[in-house]
């Protein structure tokens, strides 16, 4: 068992989080393994987690086996490069005299855009609407739909915060645009 230092990191605005206190998210790092990162979403429907390993491409996911189930699936994935078949670019060189390749342009303009500056985390407010079919799939309730949205945002924010320096947060009244009724369906 690996202990983690965990802190609350809600995907909901403070007002929306106060309306739905049983739906939240957490982030954490390994106490004895600081290279391990954790993202966890919690709701009455259950928990979902992602643990990033020693390399950013090593991931363990813990998910409910199915909607309404108390069984969980643990999936560990590791991306392994195939050294037997190394990558070889088959794109032909430009045939136009004086044309520059993308590699030439990038080399000339070193680091035009930094993908993520670890010291800056930009927060974007997100208003996310879903159809009644989406809500039906997750139990037909507002809480079930918001719990599913929270699970998705937990995974997205894990990637976006690491790679882009961006965090998405649901707006205050996002519950008003989650459609749980088949009629009238605005879609």
Predicted regions and their residues:
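N-terminal prosegments of processed precursors
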Residues: 1-67
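Fold-level signature of zinc-dependent metallopeptidase catalytic domains
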Residues: 71-187
């Amino acid at each position: 068992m690996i202990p983690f230092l965990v802190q609350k990191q809600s995907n909901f605005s403070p007002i929306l989080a106060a309306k739905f206190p049983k739906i939240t998210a957490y982030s954490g790092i390994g106490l004895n393994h600081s290279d391990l990162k954790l993202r966890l979403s919690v709701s009455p429907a259950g928990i979902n987690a992602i643990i990033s390993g020693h390399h950013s491409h090593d991931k363990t996911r813990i998910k409910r086996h199915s909607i309404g189930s108390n069984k969980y699936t643990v999936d560990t994935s590791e991306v392994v490069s195939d050294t037997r078949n190394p990558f070889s670019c088959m794109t032909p060189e430009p045939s136009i005299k004086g044309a520059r390749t993308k590699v030439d342009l990038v080399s000339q303009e070193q680091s035009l855009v930094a993908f993520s500056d670890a010291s800056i985390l930009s927060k974007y407010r997100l208003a996310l609407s879903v159809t009644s079919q989406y809500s039906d799939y997750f139990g037909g309730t507002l809480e079930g739909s918001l719990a599913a949205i929270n699970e998705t945002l937990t995974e997205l924010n894990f990637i976006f915060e690491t790679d882009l320096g961006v965090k998405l947060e649901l707006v205050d009244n996002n519950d008003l645009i989650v459609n749980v009724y088949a009629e009238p369906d605005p879609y």
